[in-house]
Amino acid sequence: MKGLLLIGIFMFCPVSILWGQDRIQQYAGTAMPYPVVKDSSGFFQDSMVPFYVNHLGRHGARFPTSGKALNRVKEILELARRENRLTSGGVTLLSTIQNLSETFDGQWGKLSVVGEEEQRGIARRMIERYPQLFSDSVKVQAIATYVPRCIHSMDAFLACMVEFNSSLHIQRNEGKQYNDCLLYTSDAA
């Protein structure tokens, strides 16, 4: 009986681990990278003609907003090292955390290079999929909250658009006055 129980547990483990990964992606919200949709053919039918795009996006990938959690783990690991209670895995983890702290120093909350590329990729795909909407000197209005990573995301997005069409008429705004219409928080995100 124990053998059957163990077999059942081991059979279920891989499924539960995979199920857990889906849950992480589902509930991680803005901590996950932007998904890239490769096939947009299902977005509209052949008889439909796009005439307007309204893109409401979040900032791209960023550095963590603070080092508090990282510092707390580092303090615990350093205490364990001083007391000679750190395993070889712990030594490796401490080294990794020290390297991360140095790498992130002065970068907390800032948009990362990956975040810039995410924004540029969204703009590029939009222009490639709907070129008729971005021809000539069409007007593009862009707004962002006052948060630097959001402004930087908007600028990366717009820079890519200008690379494709330098005659675009871009109206760019930023500030706290846009928070009510742009800043949305959710328990699920």
Locations of the language-model features?
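Extended hydrophobic secondary-structure segments that form protein cores and membrane-embedded regions
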Residues: 54-57, 139-146, 171-174
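Solvent-exposed loop/turn segments at secondary-structure junctions
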Residues: 60-63, 147-150, 177
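Conserved small/polar residues in nucleotide/adenosyl-binding loops
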Residues: 184-189
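N-terminal regions that are enriched for targeting/export leaders
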Residues: 21-110, 121-125
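Bacterial Sec-dependent N-terminal signal peptides
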Residues: 1-22
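Loop-to-helix element that buttresses phosphate recognition and phosphoryl-transfer chemistry
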Residues: 105-129, 142-144, 157
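Short, solvent-exposed loop/turn and secondary-structure capping segments
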Residues: 65-69, 153-156, 167
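Extracellular/periplasmic catalytic domains that process cell-envelope and extracellular macromolecules
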Residues: 46-50, 135, 150
